[in-house]
C-alpha cells in the first residue's frame, strides 16, 4: 500500500525533526536550516547534507557531496530505504557523518 500524502508529510516532518534533534545533541559544530520542508545540515568542513521531499514520488531525497540519493519509506521495517542500493537512511547518514567529521553518531531512531 502506498503512502497517503498526509502520512508521507508526517513521516518526512518527523524524520527531519529527529535529524535536527540528533545533530543538536551531538556536540558537532553544524548549522541547521529548515525552510519550506528542506533541511540543510552544514558542517564546519563546508560539507552539506540537504534533505528534501519529493511529494509526487513519496520519496525523501538526500543531496550530498557524493550525489543524490532517493529513499522510499518501508512500512514493514518503519525505515527509509534507498531505492537503488536498499541501504537504510540511518546507515548512510552514519557513514557520511563519519566521513565528514570523524564522529560516530547513531541514527537508528530514523
Curated annotation (Swiss-Prot):
Which GO BP terms apply?
Answer: iron-sulfur cluster assembly
Q: Name one GO molecular function term.
A: ferrous iron binding
Is Glycoprotein among this UniProt entry's keywords?
no
Q: Which HAMAP family match?
A: CyaY (MF_00142)
Q: What SMART domains does this protein map onto? A: Frataxin_Cyay
The UniProt keywords, alphabetically, are: Iron, Metal-binding
Instruction: Report the sequence similarity comment from the record.
Output: Belongs to the frataxin family.
NCBIfam families membership? FeS_CyaY (TIGR03421)
State the protein's purpose: Involved in iron-sulfur (Fe-S) cluster assembly. May act as a regulator of Fe-S biogenesis.
Q: What's one Pfam family here?
A: Frataxin_Cyay
Q: Which organism is it from?
A: Pseudomonas fluorescens (strain SBW25)
Gene Ontology terms, cellular component aspect? cytosol
**Entry protein name:** Iron-sulfur cluster assembly protein CyaY
> What domain of life?
Bacteria
Amino acid at each position: 500500500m502506498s503512502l497517503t500524502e498526509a502520512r508521507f508529510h508526517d513521516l518526512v516532518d518527523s524524520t527531519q525533526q529527529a535529524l535536527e534533534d540528533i545533530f543538536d545533541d551531538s556536540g558537532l559544530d553544524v548549522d541547521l536550516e529548515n525552510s519550506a520542508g528542506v533541511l540543510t545540515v552544514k558542517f564546519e568542513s563546508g560539507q552539506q547534507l540537504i534533505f528534501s521531499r519529493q511529494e509526487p514520488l513519496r520519496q525523501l531525497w538526500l543531496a550530498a557531496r557524493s550525489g543524490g540519493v532517493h529513499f522510499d519509506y518501508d512500512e514493514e521495517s518503519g525505515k527509509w530505504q534507498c531505492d537503488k542500493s536498499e541501504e537504510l537512511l540511518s546507515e548512510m547518514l552514519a557513514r557520511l557523518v563519519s566521513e565528514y567529521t570523524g564522529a560516530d553518531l547513531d541514527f537508528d531512531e530514523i
